[in-house]
């Protein structure tokens, strides 16, 4: 009988750790509740080690633990979202674990999922808001989308790990506009939360300068973009 000698079953349990690691401090923080998908919404995929067998389920709720699986070595993954779909409120959670299916046995699998893309938020200081009539910030991960944070945007965006460029568009009260790239995040990794903060202050010469920070190295020594620099000379 086909199911009696060469097949087993899998009992899977999926959990999700919604904590992200802010690069401005050492303690992890929980992601916004509204962005925390229920594990029942996570999709499942089972792939044999030799690639000869692959099966997917749209959700954990669709998976029947009585499903007969050919004996062999597998990797089972659970995921929510898509690494290639970037944007606001687009977290991508992923977890995977190896599992051995044995004849007429029920193998238990526990999969813990964590954020597999990068969380980015943008904040503007009150001084910054008063100085400029309009402003926006656009981030771009290598090979990914261009995501614009308008002046009123408060949501988090999620992008692929890797290099992330930061572009800022500013409009002064007198109508003069300028666009420049004040900084880049060279190697953002999965599960990190970058809080990009933009501020404006006066330097020792009494000239307005922009300050941008996004990690522990620029938190106390922000990158300064002076009005005298080429990219912002019009400001």
Predicted regions located by residue number:
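Extracytoplasmic cysteine-anchoring/structural motifs
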Residues: 1-43, 68, 75-91, 96-103, ...
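N-terminal, post-signal-peptide region of Sec/Tat-exported proteins
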Residues: 33-58, 64
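Signal that preferentially marks extracellular ectodomain short beta-strand elements
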Residues: 55-71, 82-85
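Short beta-strand segments within Ig-like beta-sandwich modules, predominantly Fibronectin type-III
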Residues: 54-61, 145-151
